[in-house]
Amino acid sequence: AALLEGLQATQQGLRALLHGLGLAPDVHGQPAWPFAHRVAVEMLVVDAGHARRVLLSLLCVGVALLALAVSVASRRGRKPLWWLAAALVVFAPWPHRHLLLTPAVATSLHQSPTGFTAQGIVHGQAVYQQHCVRCHGASANGEGPDAARLAMWPPNLNGALLWKRLDGELFWRVRHGMQGRNGAQTMPGFGITQLTDAQVWEVLDYLQAHAAGQMLRESGTWDRPVRLPDVAVLCRQGRQH
């Protein structure tokens, strides 16, 4: 978890730096990720072996940089330190590129600004029922009345799928749609004239809350982490929190 959070924070920091330099303009209200790829932090959770390789490689690079720094400050014994740094880089257990990097979009690192409030979830439910239920189904299981007519059957949104994607990339898919490998559209996008950015975030909040509830109903456990909705609580003393 610490490795995942550290790598994600590093990417967020790089984006903030580029935004400050004017190299990452605002897109949908937040700084854009300006690169075609990003570090696939979600793979660190899925593949423990890959996570170990990433951690060990980072340690090797860190020790190699330390050896080079010491060699610069030292007048003696520079060559052994250089050889040590080179050996660490050469023999580091580098992770496979296709596991380390994944294609990115401008909103990949965007984070929901809604606060996951109860009101926002209710608003998102209304948006879903108006714009999404025909394809994804009333229970979000991908079996809506129009699903069979699509080029690709809609996914079941009641499982762990939403936790395997970054919020910003889910936002992009709702806003801009999806295409199959052959370029054919598999899901239409909803432009700014159809849904506001706030509505897109709210429907994603609703889907996550709904999926968590469905998994709890089926398994009796919270299989995936979900935030507690921000709600006002009225205590017996009449105080609101």
Protein language model regions, located:
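Membrane-embedded alpha-helical segments of integral membrane proteins
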Residues: G29-S71
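Internal/C-terminal transmembrane anchor helices
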Residues: G77-T102, Y128
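N-terminal "domain-start" segment that seeds a small globular fold
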Residues: L101-S112, L216-Q240
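Electrostatic cytochrome c docking/interface patches
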Residues: A104-V127
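Sequence context surrounding c-type heme c attachment/ligation sites in exported
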Residues: I121-V133, R165-E169, Q194-D197
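The canonical Cys-X-X-Cys-His
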Residues: G124-S139, M187, V203-L207
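Gly/Gly-Pro-rich "capping" loops immediately C-terminal to redox-active cysteine motifs
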Residues: Q125, G137, N141-W172
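Axial heme c-ligation environment in periplasmic c-type cytochrome domains
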Residues: A148-P155, R175-W201, H210
